[in-house]
């Protein structure tokens, strides 16, 4: 999938109404789903968190984090976090839109922003937070037939998604947000998934 095809499909559908779940003591956070075109194919930018972090160590994630008091709004939070984690300057980011707010078990409600960056964009990792940055062809993670789902009845949400890619396993909130992006871009394929349990 190239840049033009993605933008056409993404813009076909209206932006989601932002509705936060009525849950107490949830903190605002954001992620930036960054897309970059390489050899006429869009890739999604992912990071592997440092194994020394206190929370979610070693997991695959998007750049992002919690909103701070001095942030003007959630988009400002997303741009600040991307700058801190991977050295991405705010002026190098083109925001395309956003997805539904995504609640996670750590008492955060996460707003995913979708954005484009240029192919030659350099990165500078904060080694304390990010062990590695890599890209995955967007088509690989948007095809719902590659998504696995595990159903858990006692969680805030009852489905945990897994998206294997080569030797990596994208799972949890990161996979869930990619699933939402896939459903937004390909609504006709929403019911396709591979269950891990009955």
Please identify what each model-predicted range represents.
Residues 127-157:
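Amphipathic alpha-helical blocks and their helix-capping loop/short-beta junctions
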Residues 122-126:
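Short, solvent-exposed recognition segments
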Residues 1-61, 66-120, 130, 151-152, ...:
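N-terminal leader/linker segments that precede catalytic domains of diphosphate-processing enzymes
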